[in-house]
Curated annotation (Swiss-Prot):
This is Methylthioribose kinase. Its EC number is 2.7.1.100. Catalyzes the phosphorylation of methylthioribose into methylthioribose-1-phosphate. It catalyses: 5-(methylsulfanyl)-D-ribose + ATP = 5-(methylsulfanyl)-alpha-D-ribose 1-phosphate + ADP + H(+). It comes from Yersinia pestis (strain Pestoides F). The gene is mtnK. It is an enzyme of class 2 (transferase). Substrate binds at D229, R344. PANTHER family: METHYLTHIORIBOSE KINASE (PTHR34273:SF2).
Length: 407
C-alpha cells in the first residue's frame, strides 16, 4: 500500500501487522473504529484475545461531518506525526509514542493507551489525578523550550517554522477562536436564551480589540512548536501518568496559546462543576481546578526558567533576567488565550461536555453564562496581570469581577 486510499478495518489490521511493532503480528485480527472526531479515522487494533494492542490513525481528505465540500490537505497527518515525534524527543514520558507514520497514506501507528483515561471524562466524573497538573506543566515546559529560540539555532528554527506550516488547520483555529464568536456566523452554536450575552460580546469594543491583538499574535509570533489543540480531551491520564495525543494542529506559534488553551479547559470544568456534582463535591472540585491552574503555570514557568539557565544557546537570550521577562509576556498571552477558549467552547462550533452534559437546563445555562463572563474578564484583564496567584484569588473571591488593574 502506497497511494492514498481511505482505510477499511481490514486495511488497518494489515497495516498494524506490518508496522505495529508487536511480537506476534498475525495475532492482530480485528479493528474497531473509535474516532469521534471530524477529521480522521481512528482504529483500535485487537488481538485474538480481544486485547487492544495498537492504534491506527488516518487523516481524511475532508471534514467528516460536512463531507467532500470541505476538503482538507492530507499533509496535516505528517505534521501531526512529526510534532509528536519532536515532542517525544524532549518529553517522551508525556507524549504518545508514534511507532510508524507514512506521509503518502496520511496514516500513523501509535501505542495503545487503553490503560489510561481521557482527562476530561475523569474531571467530569470527579476523579482526581493529583500529579496530572504538574506533569502537564512539565510537558509544556520541555516541548516549548526545546523548540524555541532559546534552544534552537536561528537556522534550524527558521527551517522548522517552514516545515510545520499548517495553514488549513490554523485557519480553523483562527476562525473558531477569534472570529466566529464575535460575529453572527452559521458555525456558532448556543442556546437562544444566551443571545443577550452573545450580543453583548459582539458589541464590546474593548473586548474585540483585545481579541484582535490575540489573533494577530497567533498569526505572527512563531515562538515554538505548539501542540496546537491541547485540551483535557487530548490528554490521557492514569495513576501517576499523563500522555498527550492528537497534535494535528501543530505549528510554530505563540507559547502562551498552548498554555492558555490548557488552562481554559481546567476553568471550563471549574465553571461546569456546580451542574455536574453536589454542592460539597462541586466546591471541592472547583478548589482543585484552581490549584491545578496554579500548578500548571508554576511548574511550566519554573522548569522553563531552569532550562533556560542550563541550556539557552543564544548568548543574548541567555542574558540574566531575560527568560523571566519573557515569561511575563507568555503569561499575559496565556490568560488572554484562556479567556478565548472559555468563550469559543460555550457559543462556538465545538463545545465541551463539562458544560453541555449538565442535565438541569437552568443550571447548564447558569454555568454557560459563568464561562462567558469569566472568559470575557480574563481577556480584558490579561495585559495587566503579573502572576497566577492574583488571578486565581480574584476568581475565587468573585468569578465575574476581574477588572483591568494590576494583579
Amino acid at each position: 500500500m502506497s497511494r492514498y486510499h481511505t482505510f477499511t478495518a481490514a486495511d488497518a489490521v494489515e497495516y498494524a501487522r506490518q508496522f505495529g511493532q508487536v511480537a506476534d503480528p498475525q495475532a492482530l485480527v480485528t479493528a474497531d473504529e473509535i474516532g469521534d472526531g471530524n477529521l480522521n479515522l481512528v482504529f483500535k487494533i485487537r488481538d485474538t484475545a480481544g486485547i487492544s494492542r495498537v492504534i491506527v490513525k488516518q487523516a481524511l481528505p475532508y471534514v467528516r461531518c460536512v463531507g467532500e465540500s470541505w476538503p482538507l490537505m492530507l499533509d496535516r497527518a505528517r505534521i501531526e506525526a512529526e510534532t509528536l515525534l519532536t515532542h517525544s524527543q524532549f518529553c517522551p514520558q508525556h507524549t504518545v509514542k508514534v511507532l510508524h507514520h507514512d506521509a503518502e497514506l496520511a496514516v500513523m501507528v501509535q501505542e495503545d493507551l487503553s490503560d489510561h483515561h481521557i482527562w476530561r471524562h475523569e474531571l467530569i466524573q470527579g476523579n482526581y489525578y493529583p500529579q496530572a497538573a504538574e506533569q502537564l506543566g512539565e510537558y509544556l515546559a520541555q516541548t516549548l523550550f526545546h523548540t524555541s529560540d532559546f534552544y534552537q539555532s536561528a537556522q534550524a528554527k527558521k527551517a522548522a517554522v517552514s516545515r510545520y506550516t499548517n495553514p488549513e488547520l490554523c485557519q480553523i483555529t483562527e476562525d473558531l477562536f477569534f472570529t466566529d464568536p464575535y460575529i453572527e456566523h452559521e458555525r456558532n452554536n448556543f442556546d437562544p436564551v444566551l443571545l443577550p450575552e452573545v450580543l453583548s460580546l459582539r458589541q464590546d469594543k474593548a473586548l474585540k480589540l483585545a481579541v484582535a491583538s490575540l489573533k494577530h499574535r497567533f498569526l505572527s509570533q512563531a515562538e515554538a512548536l505548539l501542540h496546537g489543540d491541547i485540551h483535557s480531551g487530548s490528554i490521557f491520564v492514569a495513576d501517576g501518568r499523563l500522555k498527550t495525543i492528537d497534535a494535528e494542529f501543530g505549528f510554530y506559534g505563540p507559547i502562551g496559546f498552548d498554555i492558555g488553551t490548557a488552562l481554559g479547559n481546567l476553568l471550563l470544568n471549574y465553571c461546569g462543576l456546580p451542574g455536574l456534582a453536589g454542592p460539597r463535591d462541586a466546591a471541592a472540585g472547583r478548589e482543585q481546578r484552581l490549584n491545578d491552574v496554579q500548578t500548571v503555570w508554576q511548574t511550566f514557568a519554573a522548569r522553563f526558567l531552569a532550562l533556560s539557565q542550563e541550556k539557552a544557546q543564544d548568548p543574548a537570550l541567555a542574558t540574566e533576567g531575560y527568560a523571566a521577562q519573557f515569561l511575563q509576556h507568555v503569561w499575559r498571552d496565556a490568560i488572554g488565550y484562556c479567556g478565548s477558549e472559555l468563550i469559543r467552547r460555550t457559543i462556538g462550533l465545538a463545545h465541551v461536555a463539562d458544560l453541555d452534559s449538565i442535565d438541569d437546563q437552568e443550571m447548564r445555562r447558569a454555568c454557560q453564562r459563568h464561562a462567558l463572563s469569566l472568559g470575557r474578564a480574563l481577556i480584558l484583564v490579561a495585559p495587566h496581570v503579573d502572576d497566577v496567584g492574583g488571578v486565581v484569588a480574584r476568581i475565587r473571591q468573585s468569578p465575574s469581577s476581574l477588572t483591568p488593574q494590576r494583579c
